[in-house]
Amino acid sequence: MAKNVVVVGCQWGDEGKGKLVDLLTDRVGAVVRFQGGHNAGHTLVIKGKKTILHLVPSGILRNNVLCVIGNGVVLSPSALMEEIRMLEQEGVPAQERLKISPACPLVLPYHVALDQARETARGERAIGTTGRGIGPAYEDKVARRTLRVGDLSDENRFAANLAEIMDYHNFILRDYYQAEVVSYEQVLEQALEFKAKFSHLVTDVPMLLAKLRREGKNILFEGAQGAFLDIDHGTYPFVTSSNTTAGSAATGSGVGPHDLDCVVGITKAYATRVGHGPFPTELEDDTGAHLAQRGQEFGATTHRPRRCGWLDLVALRRAAIINSISSLCITKLDVLDGLKRLCLCVAYHYNEEQCSEMPLDSDALVRCKPIYMELLGWQESTVGITEYEQLPLAARLYLEKIEELSGVPIDIISTGADREQTIILRDPYGI
């Protein structure tokens, strides 16, 4: 029987979703992106070759897998055109494998200009966005003034609506931010170029996915960012502009929630965060520097260094609740190789009391101090191990403690960047 699996991040993004999605795509008929935009970077490593994707789903490197961009994604024509060009240069027939919802809002140059002007104006209070226009594009969607992929079917109407929208946004840029305005002609030219090249990829995504399910095809729903960047459930205001939690898989694709069968949550064996915002277990010492260096912790999209810290089980328990996590995938276990001691955050010290639940308020979370459980590390290398029993005893005890204190079983463990460097204890698709 066909099975629909959702893959989401349980931290602040960068957990390794791209690798897991790529690994599981040989079991599915389609991979669906359901939220976010080209602010997300998913890194795939196959036989040592690295591919970084931002909009195209991570199944694109597999033959016979349909890659679908759902309505919850805000789509930059220029970014998608560049990504498709890059893939085709590498011999990947991206257009043969890709479908796009007509309901995707477009991210256009004036969104980028607004995003960057705002961050500049905020100064030290900047959110730390990627500056790629994602927030302003989602704002236009909610304000019901967005231009969508499907609007390009009528070029005259699109041009007229674009002129009206740009009058508004250029007024804000010029008169509020004292920034340069954006050229209407250049934006229109870019949008029409996208239509000319890729309009054949546009399809009714909910009907397509329903058809695949009737045909008995497995589907994988690929989340972007992570649970605590969710606009509602994250560390607001240091969040992204979309719902990154599993519920968005339904609204961002058009699949009914009853048809989502299980949710795999991904977390690193430690924790990272890019940009501003509370991070209770952050390590600003030699151990944090070691994790960053060993884990090559630089953003795939922004190339900004990631902040590193110990795994936060208080946060992980909350992520499991708000996503209905069925099982966990632990990534970058090998990064912990060689450390003499490891720590797991099991509670917080807040307002002179011990707190076992993560506060949603960012100001409160900043004041939370981690309470750690110490465990022995291991000196052996775990890189490339594919059998659980081959892991060092201390590594197995570490994983078992994560299972015990999170309340969620671990089904998959990543021991390196390559697709093959993985331990699969239980397959989400039952294969």
Curated annotation (Swiss-Prot):
GO cellular component, alphabetical, reads: cytoplasm
- Establish whether keyword Metal-binding is in the entry: yes
Q: What class of enzyme is it?
A: ligase
Q: Which residues bind GTP?
A: 13-19, 41-43, 306, 332-334, 414-416
The UniProt record gives the binding positions of substrate as 300-306
Q: Where in the cell is it found?
A: Cytoplasm
Q: What does this protein do?
A: Plays an important role in the de novo pathway of purine nucleotide biosynthesis. Catalyzes the first committed step in the biosynthesis of AMP from IMP.
| NCBIfam families reported in the protein's UniProt record | PRK01117.1 (NF002223), purA (TIGR00184)
Q: What is this protein called?
A: Adenylosuccinate synthetase
This protein's encoding gene: purA
